[in-house]
Amino acid sequence: PGQQVLLTGWGVGENHWGGLATQARVKGDWLVPMPKGMDGRKAMIVGTAGFTAMLCVMALEDAGIRPESGEVVVTGASGGVGSTAVTLLHKLGYQVAAVSGRESTHDYLRQLGANRILSRDEFAETRPLEKQVWAGAVDTVGDKVLAKVLAQMNYGGCVAACGLAGGFALPTTVMPFILRNVRLQGVDSVMTPAARRTEAWERLVRDLPESFYTQSATEITLSQAPDYASKIM
């Protein structure tokens, strides 16, 4: 056998056919060497969502957000990106607040490491500036939720924004940026350069607890994929 590799992003399964293929012919530059301690099964449990979550955590670290900086909020916390972000942040020693619209996921989020859970309803309306609450944030939702998070950021805080589950609009003002020195850092996982990809996957091996792989995955056969795809949609 040849070298073990993994592939996420670059439009595969989106602009390029073959999402469920057992073999693929792709550009070598798209591939990442399988990091030591990872295998194909674990890599696909992590998937694009987990990889994106790791990039978000790295973005907060790059902005100087440390566990002692204060609480970090994760929106859309019960989704793939959000749940992995909660797990990673908890493992790294951060105090994590998880925002979820589904009460049925609260126990699951606590198991992953959320210190407290907030209802999505609390993020429906916002003012230009609100009480400072968060040192950092991972936002997967966008729209009013992201606007609320920005208004609640501590001075010098950073929001890693990677999703638009709630919409692509951003009804905010410049106030958090010019009065509180808040950083809004976009995070894209599709076109991430090779060096950053390799670093993120190596971090995932180190920073994701083994328990995550059993808590966050349901294994099915290939023939079951269409039925499960319908359920997800």
Regions found by a protein language model. Name each.
Residues 6, 135-138, 160:
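N-terminal Rossmann-like NAD(P) cofactor-binding module of classical short-chain dehydrogenase/reductase
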Residues 7-73:
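NAD(P)H dinucleotide-binding glycine-rich loop of Rossmann-like/cofactor-binding domains
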Residues 10, 122, 141-142, 163-164:
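Short glycine-/small-residue-rich Rossmann-like dinucleotide-binding loops
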Residues 15, 144-211:
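Glycine-rich phosphate-binding loop and adjacent beta-alpha segment
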Residues 47-120:
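Mid-domain Rossmann-like dinucleotide-binding core that forms the NAD(H)/NADP(H) cofactor-binding site
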Residues 123-133:
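Short amphipathic alpha-helix with an adjacent loop that forms part of the alpha/beta core around
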Residues 195-233:
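C-terminal hydrophobic helical "lid"/dimerization subdomain
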